[in-house]
Structure formats: C-alpha cells, structure tokens
UniProtKB/Swiss-Prot annotation:
UniProt xrefs under InterPro entries: PABS, PABS_CS, SAM-dependent_MTases_sf, Spermi_synthase, Spermi_synthase_euk, Spermidine_synt_N, Spermidine_synt_N_sf
Native species: Datura stramonium (Jimsonweed)
Listed name of the protein: Spermidine synthase 1
EC number: 2.5.1.16
Regions annotated as coiled coil: none
Keyword terms of this UniProt record: Polyamine biosynthesis, Spermidine biosynthesis, Transferase
Domain of life where this protein originates: Eukaryota
Annotated S-adenosyl 3-(methylsulfanyl)propylamine binding sites: 48, 79, 103, 123, 154-155, 173
Amino acid sequence: MEEANNKESPYISSILPGWFSEISPLWPGEAHSLKVEKILFQGKSDYQNVMVFQSSTYGKVLILDGVIQLTERDECAYQEMITHLPLCSIPNPKKVLVIGGGDGGVLREVSRHSSVEQIDICEIDKMVIDVSKQFFPNVAIGYEDPRVKLHVGDGVAFLKFVAEGTYDAVIVDSSDPIGPAQELFEKPFFESVARALRPGGVVCTQAESIWLHMHIIEDIVANCRQIFKGSVNYAWTTVPTYPSGVIGFMLCSTEGPAVDFKNPINPVDADDSHTKTRGPLKFYNSEIHSASFCLPSFAKRVIESKGK
C-alpha cells in the first residue's frame, strides 16, 4: 500500500492553502472545504484516487477521486440510515447483500441484527478496504463478523451469478454516478437487484441530494417504479460533510408480502445487545426512521409525479 508523502494532492486548495476543497461537476458553482492537519495516505488504485487526511474538526476523512466518502465525526448518519431503514422494515432478515461499502460501515450496522445469518459484500476496490481497515478501524470493524463473506469484484457482474430470490435485502452503498459506480444507477442493475431478492425483499440504494440532483433522482424513481412492484419510496438524512449537507435513499420492495417502509417493524434500537461490540447507535432511532420519509414540498411533487 502506498503511504502518505509530501507530494501535494491535487485536491488541496491552492486558494486556501492547507484546506481540502471538494469540487465536482455534480455540484457546479460550490465547494465544501475542511482544514487539513496532516495527509495520512495517498494512493491510486486500479479504479480511483484514494486519500486519507486528519482534519481539524471532523477527525479522519476518506476521499475517493476528490470526493468525501466519510468522516469519523458524521459517518454514523449515513451508515446507520442506509442500513436500518431497509432492515428494520422487514421481519427477521436472514440473507443480506452489500454492494460497495468497502469501508465496512454498512457491515458494522448489518451485524447489529441478530436474525441475519449471511452477509455478502461485493466491493470493486481492494485499496478502499485495506485503507479503511488501517485508518478507520471503528468503521471497518464490520469485516470482523464471522457472518461476512467478502467478494472483491464488480457488483454488476456479481449479481448476474446470484440465484433468483436469494436475498432478503440488498444495500447499495455506492459513490456518485461517475467513474466505477455509474452502472449502479442504471436500469439493468436495478433489474438484477430485483431478481436477486425474494418476494417482499427490499433494496436501499444511495440516491443523491434533493438540493443538487433532482434530475438524477427523477430517473432513479422512474426506473424503480417500472421494476419494483411492491413499494417505492424516497428517504433522506443529514450528513454535514456531504454536498448540500443531505443525502437520499431509494427504498423499494419486490412484489410479495407488503412492506411499509415508513413504519419500522423490526426496531434495532430496542435491543442493546449489539452495543458491546459495535458501540451504541449514534443517529438512527425509530422516530427518525419514520421522519426520514417526510419530504420538502418541491421534492415530494417531483417524486410523486413519477408514480403517475
């Protein structure tokens, strides 16, 4: 693994020396900056540039291709919500597939559910896994669960070999729809996910920001309504270091036993047996679960129009 060196990163701002600035065509005309105390790692995998730095205010930060993936301070808001929104909406999930999520945070959260017997994870970039284990052990702790089976490879290709109806839940923890994650936002991928789910199975996928990406969200909603014949919903949460400070999730179910995503029936926050090894939940609870489906009027109009 390539270690940090004194070579200046292209993502360290030349306008504000010593600050990391997140600049992307996905959010033109704006940037979010964090003060850098020390660059801990820089490397280039077969798929993307990887960087870790110590920030002044958010702890250690993981960057992929110039975009913040997680910080120690606020990763809980994303990891807990993308995991427990789907898993708390169905009774006794047993088989779970995670696509992406190489940092291990979703695995950490899935492992809180005692009913789960099998956790498969398919991550394309081994460097992300190795870097997360080295610099974010409290996140990557999920890999230590004996129920976890790691598959290093392309999630799209992995799904093609999954038997129909294998999983109770699929969680797609992808980066933004450019580069290696682009296929994870396209219709053929969602069709593969639906085939891999049992009747009444659920999927939760990262679905961008209502403030920045309504055009992308519209396409995702339209595709999901064509493919998933159960329930299709959009939820959101707040993550301060993500662009616009919020991130959304598509939650869908296949035809079969009805799933009411807005009313959790399998509350993980009612059982504290998992806290000894995973620590207490920092963000998720049953009340915020239901509240996350309440959308601002402008977003509600657009998303509901795609169901007509």
